[in-house]
Amino acid sequence: MEAAAALLVEGGFETLRHRAVAERAGLPLASTTYYFDSLDELIAAAVEHHGRTELDRGRAQLAEVPAEPRDLDSVVDLVLDQLLGPPAGKRDAELVLLRYERLVATGRRPYLRPLMRTLGDELRGLLREVLARSGSPVDDRRLEQLIALVDGAVVNALIAVDPDPRAVAHRMLRESLQP
């Protein structure tokens, strides 16, 4: 599954094919077709594996965060790490773009909707805990607003070909959370 998830992250849904996954994993083609009868099953497994890996990373990060008030920029960085993944230097904008391409492309794959709802619920729970531990608790409605704000900021930055969509999202989220 790691090979499939890596292909998904690197190139989106179009790169996920039984043959490509088998080649990446160094396995014969029959090994992927044995476990996944259809491409949809392979895609769903890759999305779930990647989503769970990201949630595990987020939980590990949260475990390292002491429950204490923190400055606004630290809170914003923690939230963005959960929503956009950790900063990736020169590849950050590209990885953020690929992340949003995957999110939008799931809309054309109805079989992924239940999984995406489940992963989204878990992510929102993680974000609520990040904010609460940081001294900035929010209710469900406010959390949805913050997520929508980040999503909108990132999409607008990507459309404008802004070289740093994370910085745009950081600025807007910071302004929204400022007392």
Where in the sequence are the language-model features?
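Short, basic, alpha-helical segments at the C-terminal edge of helix-turn-helix-like DNA-binding modules
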Residues: 48-54
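Solvent-exposed, amphipathic alpha-helical segments
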Residues: 3-11, 57, 61-64, 102, ...
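Residue cluster at the C-terminal edge of the helix-turn-helix DNA-binding motif
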Residues: 10, 24, 35, 53, ...
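Amphipathic alpha-helical packing segments from all-alpha helical-bundle domains
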Residues: 55-56, 60, 90-100, 108-134, ...
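Residues in soluble alpha-helical coiled-coils and helical-bundle/repeat scaffolds
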Residues: 34-41, 66-67, 107, 111, ...
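Hydrophobic alpha-helical connector segments
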Residues: 56-96, 143-146
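Hydrophobic/aromatic-rich alpha-helical bundle segments in the mid-to-C-terminal region
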Residues: 69, 112-117, 132-179
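Helix-turn-helix
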Residues: 6-45
